[in-house]
């Protein structure tokens, strides 16, 4: 629900705030430190303005920005955990909130490119979820593909949280993976520019509907002298309808009430359109228990490491050379 009720904590469920953080202009390590201070200040201000809020979400690239000339340099990378995430943890502990934060994480293997990483911190100041972006926005992004799968953790108000990062949300299988592992509130943090504004909104809704779960999504907002970032934080109900839709304003705080138990109840009680169940029990009316093998070729091929499109050999772009990245793999841009 999005209304004047979104100012306070609901009796059941929880109140979430998604921050349309202004796209940072980052040219030095001092700029990153300034962003961290700004994020922490905003977290405390949001809690003061919305005393009932229990989860505060910041978008992708809000910590380190999108300076593509420098974003792989050692100066711009963080360790997770590290002193910067400790600062976020202390802020969550002081404000007594859950927080979602974006980092570009130094790869423990110095021969490989960094990870694009999201963390969830609880009100005790503990990192309870760490996720590395599984699907970087190729061919633009140089991040190493994530290796932590799609983790799920306990959140406020009976929620089970998962986080995806920007382009991850365009991959329906990833939302299904989160739901399959019990997620009922799927968070998406993004740094998209306006080229995919409509598709971002569409997939936030479809990810909710296909999996009977809430989605909470927030994007950077503003202009960085190259692109405009559209903001438009969005909270979707488990039936795929939009409960709250932000605007294009930097610093806009998009709030809404979420009732995870309602999503859980739909998963338990719906017959029609309980599609996450039907996938693994197709035709259960005619065949008791249903057919458990969906018979989908791409799933079998993907599991066997043999995924290949019929047109793959004729594709024009399959590496990052169009954006100046080397094609040899390994660590570059130190």
Curated annotation (Swiss-Prot):
Key words of the record: Hydrolase
Family note: Belongs to the carbon-nitrogen hydrolase superfamily. Aliphatic amidase family.
Active-site residues, Swiss-Prot/TrEMBL: 60 (proton acceptor), 133 (proton donor), 166 (nucleophile)
GO BP: putrescine biosynthetic process from arginine
Protein name per UniProt: Formamidase
PANTHER family per the UniProt record, alphabetical: FORMAMIDASE (PTHR43674:SF15), NITRILASE C965.09-RELATED (PTHR43674)
Pfam families membership: CN_hydrolase
Domain of life: Bacteria
Annotated CN hydrolase domain residues: 14-260
PROSITE patterns, alphabetized: CN_HYDROLASE (PS50263)
InterPro entries reported in the protein's UniProt record: Aliph_Amidase/BUP, C-N_Hydrolase, C-N_Hydrolase_sf, Formamidase
Single Gene Ontology MF annotation: formamidase activity
Transmembrane segments: none
Stated role: Is an aliphatic amidase with a restricted substrate specificity, as it only hydrolyzes formamide.
Catalysed reactions, as listed in the record: formamide + H2O = formate + NH4(+)
The EC number(s) this enzyme carries: 3.5.1.49
Gene: amiF
């Amino acid at each position: 629900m999005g209304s004047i009720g979104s100012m306070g904590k609901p009796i059941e469920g929880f109140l979430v705030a998604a921050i349309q953080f202004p796209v940072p202009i980052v040219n030095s390590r001092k700029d990153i430190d300034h962003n961290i201070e700004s994020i922490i200040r905003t977290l405390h201000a949001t809690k003061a303005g919305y005393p009932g809020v229990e989860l505060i979400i910041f978008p992708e690239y809000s910590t380190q920005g999108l300076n593509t000339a420098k974003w792989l340099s050692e100066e711009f990378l963080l360790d997770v955990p590290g002193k910067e995430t400790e600062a976020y943890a202390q802020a969550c502990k002081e404000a007594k909130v859950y927080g979602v934060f974006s980092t570009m994480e130094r790869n423990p293997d110095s021969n490989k490119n960094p990870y694009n990483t999201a963390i969830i911190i609880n009100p005790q100041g503990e990192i309870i979820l760490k996720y590395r972006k599984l699907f970087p926005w190729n061919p633009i992004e140089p991040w190493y593909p994530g290796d932590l799968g799609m983790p799920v953790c306990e959140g406020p108000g009976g929620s089970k949280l998962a986080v995806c990062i920007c382009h991850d949300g365009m991959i329906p299988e990833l939302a299904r993976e989160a739901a399959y592992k019990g997620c009922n509130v799927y968070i998406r943090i993004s740094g998209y520019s306006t080229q995919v504004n409509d598709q971002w909104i569409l997939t936030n809704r479809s990810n909710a509907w296909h999996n009977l779960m809430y989605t909470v999504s927030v994007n950077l907002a503003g202009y960085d002298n190259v692109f405009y970032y559209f903001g438009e934080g969005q909270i979707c109900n488990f039936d795929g309808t939009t409960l709250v839709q932000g605007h294009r304003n930097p610093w806009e705080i998009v709030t809404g009430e979420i009732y995870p138990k309602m999503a859980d109840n739909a998963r338990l009680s719906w017959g029609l359109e309980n599609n996450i169940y039907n996938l693994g029990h197709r035709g259960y009316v005619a065949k008791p228990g249903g057919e458990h093998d969906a018979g989908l070729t791409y799933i079998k091929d993907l599991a066997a490491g043999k995924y290949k499109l019929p047109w793959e050999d004729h594709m024009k772009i399959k590496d990052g050379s169009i954006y100046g990245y080397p094609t040899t793999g390994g660590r570059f841009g130190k």
